[in-house]
Amino acid sequence: MEPSRQAIVHENFALVFFRQSILKRNDELFGSEIYAKATKQEAPLNKGYQQLHSDHPLATYYEVLTRIQLSALSQIEAAPSHSAPAPNKLFVTMNQSALLDKALIKEMNDAQAVLKKHEQQLIPSINSSSFLSFNLKEKRTIINHIHLLKDNGIEIAFDGFDLSDDSTEKLISLALFDYIKVDLTKSNFDIMVENSQDFFNRSYDCLSGMIHDSKIKFVADRVEHKALHTLARSMPFDFFQGRYYSPTELI
């Protein structure tokens, strides 16, 4: 291989797209979470890989939104006319700081307009970095942008809620969120419950209280094994996600 060509190959970065199913309590498919990771790619691109051309910090999110639309449309086109509709809840993981970008907000609204025509629902899943780290102007911008998304029919999820700490301070406002994803591995939930029945009771009361005070739906996230599955089913969760139910797949 010529040196110049070899350098180009080594400098290639590609996005790897992943999808994992989210189930209802009755084990029916509710939706899926889709995300991407950038990786240095030194071989020809295979399924699930896409060359990343831009060094823009939010380029990954733009590519994920494009992939979601293409994936949703291809599933609909491939499905027989008499088959049940594909799960219409499409969660996209992103940082809170991404909500500061007006262009990305427009891109999400445009994506939702396309998906809505095919009965699909975009759900940005905002990670649990503390809202307290933003200044007042940034907080107002994030809140305004969330309202813009919700005005266009986009539901919002909070990703990474930890039952072992006061994660509610990171939520900005309960009224802004439609879903809260509870990470059951963050606090070693099964070990904490085994060591303290009081921790289980407090966790149960915490979720029950938030459900009573709002219309939020809760997702038990990262249910990786049977012990966590058993505990999750004994809590007031609406939906379930993790390797116990389905592997993460390349798309």
What are these model-derived regions, one by one?
Residues E77-P80, L100-A113, F134-I142, S164-L176, ...:
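Distinct, well-ordered alpha-helical segments
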Residues S97, A157-G160:
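Active-site mouth loops of central-metabolism enzymes
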Residues T39-R67, Q96-A103, L115-L148, K186-Y204:
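EAL-type cyclic di-GMP phosphodiesterase domain
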Residues E2-L115:
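Bacterial c-di-GMP phosphodiesterase EAL domain
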Residues M1-F30, A36-A43, S129-S133, F161-L163, ...:
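EAL-family c-di-GMP phosphodiesterase catalytic domain
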Residues Q112, I142-G153, Y204-K215:
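Surface-exposed amphipathic alpha-helices with a cationic face
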Residues P85-L90, K117-L122, N152-E155, L176-D178, ...:
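Short, well-ordered coil/turn segments that N-cap beta-strands
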